[in-house]
Swiss-Prot record:
This is DNA mismatch repair protein MutL. It comes from Streptococcus gordonii (strain Challis / ATCC 35105 / BCRC 15272 / CH1 / DL1 / V288). One of its GO terms (biological process) is mismatch repair. This protein is involved in the repair of mismatches in DNA. It is required for dam-dependent methyl-directed DNA mismatch repair. May act as a 'molecular matchmaker', a protein that promotes the formation of a stable complex between two or more DNA-binding proteins in an ATP-dependent manner without itself being part of a final effector complex. Residues 390-400, 408-423 have a biased composition (Basic and acidic residues). One of its GO terms (molecular function) is ATP hydrolysis activity. Residues 390-423 are annotated as: Disordered.
Length: 647
């Protein structure tokens, strides 16, 4: 008897499903891509329990003929290609004929479809790949596919599913990418009756970007365009001031297909040159039109890996297109715009509206534990607050209760002093936390301050000789120990905001933040859902300075998105490192004598005044002996050759 047998088709489909259908988002991707290939202009995706209970995709495409519907459940049955040569001219998103049979083999599958010229529609019901019903029905032109109880017959796969929030986040990401790839299609994603994503389908890519990432982000995107004999590159990239902490916001499309390609990611970063800060990445949507003969999409069943001929030439074209577009832009952030933002909420951000722009010396305010350009700023704040009147907006009484006024938070460009901090990334933060936990309090010499150099280094003398102090590293250490103590010191001491802040995030980020909201709450930050893809902040811990709120909350959420499973203790420590680095005195800022002496005093009170949180030295010491050697006032001890017994 032969040992080798041909597997039953249903079993073969279940095996294939292991590669094609990894999770609910894989089902959504395959079904929506089929709808796009069918010429749909409107696609609605409805899911329940993150797709594990129900996934329903409805489109207004061309539909499937009655006699072809059962064939759609047969493996390698497709309308996209007919002969070998077609493999080299693929312009559709699907072509392998594996998705539908793979999905049907691991779910309870229902399809209703009708064509424009058909006499009636078609209803087909299958369970585990076995067709149970196939009959005519009344149905509008287009296709509706409903998937129920995904993986009901492969329980081992269910065990490896993540939380519903995580799976939903993957689905939202898939729809976002497809929306960017096909702005001409109107997408609607509904989860458990709640609308998550909606795009207009106008064909305008910038509008699609605004629908996904928000209007403020879309305004800071720059159009790019370039072409040669083989490639056409178009799309949008963010200004250097608008960055994110990872590459997740880079979308690369080839002939309308979202792909992942490390070298093309590298080309995008190369286009920015030195304009990007270390550890920061742009937002980008790059659409590449290419002769299908130069791109092999038949590499993996998911079709996200594509092999490209002339890849180096394409990389150069992308880099040049981005560099050329950025060169035409005014890359200096609009100071007037920032000042206008600060005046929207005068009663709560007075120090930003009162800065004397002609002076560059910093003064330390002991009460507020911070530096200002002018010592009178802290005093002016009181009279300013008394005279300022909050701005109130008219509200509809019938509408949902809203605060009298809100401020939409924007991500401000991070300071370029981060170029000095290549260690400001997740891996180095974790290493720094481990080292900091082992620190012990040490003694510190009494220092007498007497000068500053280049607005960066402080000079002081003590019994040990001359000390040179890096003022940024020094305050970074001071701030770190302040934040380390305060972050997570959650009590009833919350400061109510006169004008609450609104923070906007993409839908998939919203889901992940909600999933890990407990970490933020344990750090003293309480965000409430407010409208579509928005959080509102109504109060903040007293230790959190109000002028730090916009950047601080976005930074805390960015870190939340980057961090894997972590304890609240470690999350607080990493936040303390990041916030101390970004909020310390920058280089090239002169300090008055009082502020410099106060900084040295604060440094002396630190548990470890010798290193910044990243481990870099805060100060170096030249002893009197070292100085005398440098000026050759004393000589090194020498032993003569005769004394060594050579002669």
């Amino acid at each position: 008897m032969s040992k080798i047998i041909e597997l039953p088709e249903i079993l073969a489909n279940q095996i294939a499903a292991g590669e094609v259908i990894e999770r609910p988002s894989s089902v959504v991707k395959e079904l929506v891509e089929n709808s796009i290939d069918a010429g749909a202009s409107q696609i609605t995706i409805e899911i329940e329990e993150a797709g594990l209970k129900t996934i329903q995709v409805t489109d207004n495409g061309e539909g499937i003929d009655h006699e072809d519907v059962p064939l759609a459940l047969r493996r390698h049955a497709t309308s996209k290609i007919k002969k070998q040569a077609d493999l080299f001219r693929i312009r559709t998103l699907g072509f392998r004929g594996e998705a539908i049979p793979s999905i049907a083999s691991v779910s309870r599958f229902t399809i209703e479809t009708a064509t424009e010229n058909g006499q009636h529609g078609t209803l087909l019901v299958a369970q585990g790949g076995e067709i149970e019903e196939h009959e005519p029905t009344s149905s509008p032109v287009g296709t509706k596919i409903k998937i129920e109880d995904l993986f009901f017959n492969t329980p081992a796969r269910l065990k490896y599913m993540k939380s519903q929030q995580a799976e939903l986040s993957h689905i939202v990401d898939v729809i976002n990418r497809l929306s960017l790839a096909h702005p001409e299609v109107a997408f609607t994603l509904i989860s458990d009756g709640r609308e998550m994503t909606r795009t207009a389908g106008s064909g305008n890519l910038r509008q699609a970007i605004a629908g996904i990432y928000g209007l403020a982000t879309a305004k800071k995107m720059v159009e790019i365009s370039a072409s040669d004999l083989d490639f056409e590159v178009s799309g949008y990239v963010s200004l250097p001031e608008l960055t994110r902490a990872n590459r997740n916001y880079i979308t690369i499309l080839i002939n309308g297909r979202y792909i992942k390609n490390f070298l093309l990611n590298r080309a995008i970063l190369d286009g920015y040159g030195s304009k990007l800060m270390v550890g920061r990445f742009p937002l980008a949507v790059i659409n590449i039109q290419i002769d299908p003969y130069l791109a092999d999409v038949n590499v993996h069943p998911t079709k996200q890996e594509v092999r490209i001929s002339k890849e180096r030439e394409l990389m150069a074209l992308i880099s040049q297109a981005i560099a050329a577009s950025l060169k035409e832009q005014d890359l200096i952030p609009d100071a007037l715009e920032n000042l206008a933002k600060s005046t929207v909420k005068r009663a709560t951000k007075p120090e930003q509206t009162s800065l004397p722009l002609k002076e560059n010396r910093l003064y330390y305010d002991k009460e507020r534990n911070d530096f200002f350009l002018k010592p009178q700023v802290a005093e002016q704040q009181i009279s300013f607050e008394e005279s300022a009147e909050p701005i109130h907006e008219a509200t509809d009484e019938k509408a949902e209760p809203q605060p009298t006024s809100v401020k939409f938070a924007e991500r401000k460009p991070a300071s370029y002093d981060q170029l000095d901090h290549p260690e400001l990334n997740q891996a180095s933060l974790e290493r720094a936390v481990d080292k900091l936990e082992q620190e012990e309090k040490s003694s510190f010499p009494e220092l007498e301050y007497f000068g500053q150099m280049h607005g960066t280094y402080l000079f002081a003398q003590g019994k040990g000789g001359l000390y040179i102090i890096d003022q940024h590293a020094a305050q970074e250490r001071v701030k770190y120990e302040y934040y380390r103590e305060k972050i997570g010191d959650v009590d009833n001491s919350q400061q109510q905001l006169l004008v609450p802040y609104i923070f906007e995030f993409p839908a998939d980020d919203m889901l992940r933040i909600k999933q890990r909201m407990k970490l933020l709450e344990d750090a003293g930050i309480f965000l409430e859902e407010y409208g579509a893809n928005q959080f509102i902040l109504r109060e903040h811990p007293i230790w959190f300075k109000e002028e730090e709120i916009e950047d601080g909350i976005y930074e805390m959420c960015d870190m939340l998105l980057l961090t894997k499973e972590v304890s609240i203790k470690k999350y607080r420590a990493e936040l303390a490192i990041m916030m101390s680095c970004k909020r310390s005195i920058k280089a090239n800022h002169g300090l008055d004598d009082y502020s410099a002496r106060d900084l040295l005093f604060q440094l002396s009170q630190c548990d470890n005044p010798y290193n910044c949180p990243h481990g870099r030295p805060v100060l170096v010491n030249f002893t009197k002996s070292d100085m005398e050697k440098m000026f050759r006032r004393i000589q090194e001890n020498h032993t003569s050759l005769r004394e060594l017994g050579k002669y």
